[in-house]
Structures are given as structure tokens and as C-alpha cells.
Curated annotation (Swiss-Prot):
One of its GO terms (biological process) is ribosomal small subunit biogenesis. The keyword Cytoplasm applies. It comes from Campylobacter fetus subsp. fetus (strain 82-40). This is Ribosome maturation factor RimM. Gene3D superfamilies: PRC-barrel domain (2.30.30.240), RimM (2.40.30.60).
Length: 176
């Protein structure tokens, strides 16, 4: 899958005889699942939603409106283009897409700590997984560590410059 796509759901078992599939939403934007919305598999094959039951998370795709056809899609992972995601998924103030955060450099004061390589959901919060900057690794610090995404650690996120300013995080790295 090209890097301009983001994973949004996994298709589960079939339900009923008309081609409905259980949709397991892996995004924070359930409103993107609507009639006519386009999604893609790992090979860039397009799937268009014919109908979506939001209450039961059941989806039927165009040209897959029988149980036999739908069974061929069980366990498929579907993706959405980043452009469609940005257009259709509205963010509140101080909210960001994962794909905007991943790849950002993390600084405490003027010290480059590393780069965000993943975001983990833990309980009610999030952790930035950081690949430690090379010189810090050479100095004996761990090659990876985690920073909680909350006001005690994250001061500023600047998506345009791909920089995250943090505090109290060098101590986390030193004690990892």
C-alpha cells in the first residue's frame, strides 16, 4: 500500500444473506463510513459502500451484495486516501491525524530527542513511540522510548515544521 493511504477498518464475518459484513472501525472517525464512500485494499482495489448500518456496524459494498461474494472480503483490511481522510474527517482544536504526528522530530528545549515512529492507545490516553536520535543512542541511552501525549509532557505540536516540543521527556529517556 502506498504511503498516501491510511488504514481505517477490518472487515469481519458476514451477517445475513444480502452481503453484509461486520465492520471493525480502526479509526477515530466513524462518520467516514457512509453510502458512496470509497476505500481500498492492499492492492489498491476500490470498494464503494452501497449501504452502512451505523447502529450495528454492518456494511454492504457495491458488487458484493450476496453472502458468497461478501465472504471473499472477510478479514480484509481497508484503507482510505489521506486526501479523502483530511477532506471528510474534521478535527477539533488541538487534534491531529496520526499520519501528521508520525515522522515529527521531538525536542526538549533545543535537544533533539528523536522522531515519532508510532502512536499507541493505552487506556484513556496515548503514547508517542520515539526512535531516539543517534547521538543520544551512542551516548548509551535506549534506542526507543515512549512519551505520554498530555500536558505534563507535550508543550507544542507544529505539524507544518514537523516538530513537537516536549518537557520532562529527557528524564523518561534517561530512565528507560
Amino acid at each position: 500500500m502506498k504511503s498516501d493511504f491510511v488504514e481505517v477498518c477490518i472487515l469481519g464475518k458476514t451477517v445475513g444473506l444480502k452481503g453484509a459484513l461486520k465492520l471493525h472501525d480502526r479509526s477515530d472517525f466513524p462518520n467516514q463510513f457512509k453510502n458512496g464512500a470509497k476505500f481500498y485494499d492492499i492492492n489498491s482495489k476500490e470498494f464503494v459502500i452501497k449501504s452502512y448500518d451505523r447502529n450495528n456496524n454492518l456494511v454492504i459494498f457495491e458488487n458484493y451484495d450476496s453472502i458468497d461474494l461478501a465472504k471473499t472480503l472477510v478479514n480484509y483490511i481497508l484503507y482510505r486516501s489521506i486526501n479523502d481522510t483530511i477532506r471528510d474527517c474534521k478535527l477539533a482544536k488541538d487534534e491531529f491525524f496520526y499520519f501528521d504526528i508520525i515522522g515529527c522530530n521531538v525536542f526538549e528545549d533545543k535537544i533533539l530527542l528523536g522522531e515519532v515512529i508510532d502512536i499507541l492507545e493505552v487506556g484513556a490516553g496515548f503514547l508517542f513511540s520515539i526512535k531516539t536520535e543517534g547521538d543520544l543512542v551512542k551516548a548509551g541511552l535506549n534506542s526507543n522510548f515512549y512519551i505520554p501525549y498530555n500536558d505534563n509532557f507535550t508543550q507544542n505540536i507544529d505539524i507544518k515544521s514537523k516538530k513537537i516540543q516536549v518537557k520532562n521527556s529527557l528524564d523518561i529517556l534517561k530512565n528507560s
